[in-house]
Amino acid sequence: MDDKPFDRQNAAYAQALYEEFALNPEGVPEQWRDFFALGPQATAEAGLLVPEGLAENGGGRSYPEAGITSPVVAAERSAAPQEAHTMRHLLRAVAHATSFIQAYRDHGHQLSTVDPLGSEPPGHPQLDPSFFGTSLEELQELPASLVFENARDESLAVVLERLQQAYCGTIGYEFEHIEDPSVVRWLWDQVESGTHTRPLETGDRVRLLQRLTEVESLEQFLHTAYLGQKRFSIEGSDIVIPMLDLALHESAKVGAKRVVLGMAHRGRLNVLAHIVGLGYEEITREFEGIQAKGAFTVEGTGDVKYHQGAQGEQSLPDGSTIHITLAPNPSHLEFVNPVVEGMTRALQNTGYDQDAKRDPAAVVAILIHGDAAFAGEGVVAETLNLGRLDGYTPGGTVHIILDNQIGFTTLPIHGRSTRYASDLAKGFSFPIIHVNADDPEACLAAVRLAMVYRAEYHDDVIIDLVGYRRYGHNEGDEPSFTQP
């Protein structure tokens, strides 16, 4: 244990242990007992208040009298009882503040407005300060420096407002299930710094609007020209195309030369056109019953247009290009997942001999899931389990759940036993980011954080893109029959 085995945010917990040590030294863990036994000077320098009666309890080591009376002890001896009472009140307020701040980090996603259809967030009891026996008025009196190290000269009220904006906006974060505390701390720092949520510049907003217009225009053209033909529209989750654009760009920044995509039928035609670069003519050939030249095809299979695979290249802002492979999709939902993992792993190898090295940054796997399928298909769990195995890991997969809040005709309440479609990933300690599909800039922020995390830890990350389905399951569907 370090000489100071806690940071400022855990000072209230350390103080409570110190109070217990003063009454019963054997009642605290051995490592803490060793720290407290260093003496009042060491504990005072660490920022703790020396409990009354510590010298009389006979616990711990004996301390030399000369030269070690801490400033806090001296102040306590000379202070009036009212001042001592005020100090203890302050200590309790700091404890309440740290608990309330932790509640934002752990449960803020339950107040986030991630549903574009406007459902009320469920909330959580700990997101009300009264749960901890305090109030906003009491907390607002505290300086932020009592709770946050390196805090600016501002009140805790300002910090709490910033935390609410960070954790309870149109992005919700779930990190509390992650086992590695250093990873959790890193994620907190990313969220609270706001680096990934910086507003877009005007030019970037114009390009985002242009991209969304292209996505919508293709869907509307196909809907008009081929009325009633199945295409499994992406409408309601249109933002996934700009999200993939950004994922490609962010991957290239850290050395990626290729991205391997896997997805089911929903939105596949738009991905073929705007991410892989398959021409509109090739897509319309499929609607006309003519085989597209640019797709992966096998003679005699009769595979449908929204199952075709393809490959292409996308130009990046810096003038370079990145190669994109969209794996062919079987009709069995999510079965493509381990195939994409294997393709990515193989492409990461630099050679074929025993000395060949694998570069996880060179090739990135991105999987797009359906909400019902992610929760319900066993192959999803099997693939997630490969994520950290030495023989199989592709160095981190970016998962995007197209969460349109319905599985064919089944509502979430009838299709899964968990609150979120992404909850399966909690068992693997992967970070989860929920985001409102109707907030384009928030969606890009989610991708930005996911790609930075993947580059930092070479680990899987989940984006739960909460949208909706504008039409029926497919465009030939009559909702009054299939969803009465």
Where are these regions (language model features)?
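Subset of Sec-pathway N-terminal targeting signals
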Residues: 1-39
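Short acidic (Asp/Glu) and glycine-rich catalytic loops that position anionic groups and cofactors
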Residues: 10-15, 77-80, 136-145, 223-227, ...
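Extended, charge-enriched "interface" segments that sit outside catalytic cores
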Residues: 39-239, 256
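Conserved phosphate/anionic-ligand binding catalytic regions in large, soluble enzymes, centered on
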Residues: 99-116, 246-275, 369-384, 458, ...
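Phosphate/diphosphate-binding loops
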Residues: 141-154, 165, 282-295, 410-414, ...
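Structural motif corresponding to the C-terminal cap of alpha-helices
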Residues: 216, 220, 251-255, 343-351, ...
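Active-site pocket-lining segments that scaffold enzyme catalytic pockets across diverse folds
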Residues: 217, 221-281
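Cofactor-binding active-site loop characterized by glycine-rich and histidine/acidic residues
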Residues: 260-437
